[in-house]
Amino acid sequence: ALGQGLTQDAARDLGLNVGTPVGAGLIDAHAGGLGTVGAAGPSQGAQSRMAYVFGTSACTMSSSDNEAFVPGVWGPYYSAMVPGLWLSEGGQSAAGEAIAQLVRFHPAYAETLAKAAEAGQHLLEYLLEHIADVVDQPSDAMLLAKDKIVVPEFLGNRAPFADPSAKAIISGLDADVSTESLIGLYVAGITGLGYGLRQILKVQTVAGIDPKLVVISGGAGEHPIVKQLLADAAGIPIAEPSAAEPVLLGSAMLGAVASGVKQSVQQAMTDMSSLGRVYAPSSGDIAQRHLLRFQA
């Protein structure tokens, strides 16, 4: 806890009691990391998991017992997120925004946007509903991309190349102006982000940071099909947290420790969070297709 808790002025302004314990705050991504990677379940332990915050941009956070310098990945920072552990932080400068930019390029964008509005849906919600209607299994959605491959580096590469001058690449376009073609481009964009995540995982493994599970949060990754596509493209299980707002949960954990309800941040992470569904990466033909696209 910080100092003697809330001062008289702060307590009055907030409508709380003087002396209410105050925990040291964290940036939003780090608070989200606390709220996701410590839950009981498969690959338990912050060192065995990567937090992937998938919003307008994306942030990856991996914890390790020892300092590991990873090219193109920020850190390591000691006790920056989990006390006593080293934090390595990567990410993608454009993630959800990259997908939004990508679909705007397609000739069917305006027409499909109007159809989505007529149905009372957000465009991406509309596309995902159509994907669910035409595939037997979520992993099969990658087949809708056909020959389209996307490197969604519209704002450069944050990790693992740390290259602000990197540009996006869209390969495999044809003359198809249908909504189905737009769906294929969208799927190619999601898998492109997954391949970017795979690159980060790969360089971290070489440096000795080898998470076995990615825990995803953020608005851009809420749909089950998106989570499955990312798991398949990155080649690693992806879990969803049970909490709808893990950033707020992580902040609550800090408050619990400051107030003495929990004895340590690690205890709060284990006791106050849990995992939901885990999406296992595909095998067989789908996995081989993703590997070839990643290598391309």
Predicted stretch roles:
Residues 26-27, 51-57, 151:
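Short beta-strand segments
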Residues 8-16, 26-49:
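Conserved phosphate-binding catalytic cores of ATP/NTP-utilizing and phosphoryl-transfer enzymes
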